Swiss-Prot record:
The modification N6-(pyridoxal phosphate)lysine is found at residue 40. This is Alanine racemase. Catalyzes the interconversion of L-alanine and D-alanine. May also act on other amino acids. It comes from Listeria monocytogenes serotype 4b (strain CLIP80459). GO terms for cellular component: cytosol. Keywords: Isomerase, Pyridoxal phosphate. Gene3D superfamilies: Alanine racemase, Lyase, Ornithine Decarboxylase, Chain A, domain 1. The keyword Isomerase applies. Pfam families: Ala_racemase_C, Ala_racemase_N. Substrate binds at residues 134, 310.
Amino acid sequence: MVTGWHRPTWIEIDRAAIRENIKNEQNKLPENVDLWAVVKANAYGHGIIEVARTAKEAGAKGFCVAILDEALALREAGFQDDFILVLGATRKEDANLAAKNHISLTVFREDWLEDLTLEAPLRIHLKVDSGMGRLGIRTTDEARRIETTIAKDNQLQLEGIYTHFATADQLETSYFEQQLAKFQTILTSLKNRPTYVHTANSAASLLQPQIGFDAIRFGISMYGLTPSTEIKTSLPFELKPALALYTEMVHVKELAPGDSVSYGATYTATEREWVATLPIGYADGLIRHYSGFHVLVDGELAPIIGRVCMDQTIIKLPREFQTGSKVTIIGTDHGNTITADDAAHYLDTINYEVTCLLNERIPRKYIH
């Protein structure tokens, strides 16, 4: 995707905020528990390479990604000796590519291990489906058979075993406890404990630090975002949001009563009013459902009017502004703040989706 460096729309990523979130989490972890930075999906929209560099500087001991291509991008960017785990499914025919690049893969099916032809040792993390219902083995018999298969092949190493909690971001813990118990049953069925046992995502690491095992997978909260609104007041420390989204007015005009804007003419002025066109649209991740949401102009709220277009959006101004005036979509302006959580609430979604939708057409600028 082409990045729009010559357009006045940009994202600012506060590296100091990422470092602070990591340091605060590390301070509450036992010394023998590693923190792995989850940088999948372009680091949740924050930029995979720069976030990985920042996380490593802050003390992260490795990285988790969703697909092999993300792991290879990290290797190509210079992360040659760092631990990298692919959390998602990898094609069997790509196992050798992962092995040659010293990338750890998730395995969750016995047949995936059959007839592998490897030119280098492959490190494997066994995924346990303890109740998430996506990927993973579900019985002790499966776990033991896979352990036996791996032990017979000197090119395979059972480096880790892990699971993922479905309700760690909820205050009610009964389902979480069921998952943990099932995982521990499968873990103890193995003849040999792998090097890495890991279960905790951001929510679990924040609320249930006792189940850190050997490593935690620090994702959404590394970026300063709360895993869910339900646990926002139960966090052990304040999270610092790292992402802000800005643009500038490229056209300012005054509407007369009866003038309409954007596709479908869904908004019509009822009085004389000032409006501005912004060079950002749904092709950038500002989806059409943002219509009616408010942005900040000189610290004042300004509503998005009419339909969000592919490349442009129109806002109603509180008064006349100059072309080139800055607009804050996510971030702080003159003491007022619009957060990713605010956008998520308006869109009836979660903060993860808000930042992940912001694609690479918007340039990222890294500060601090």
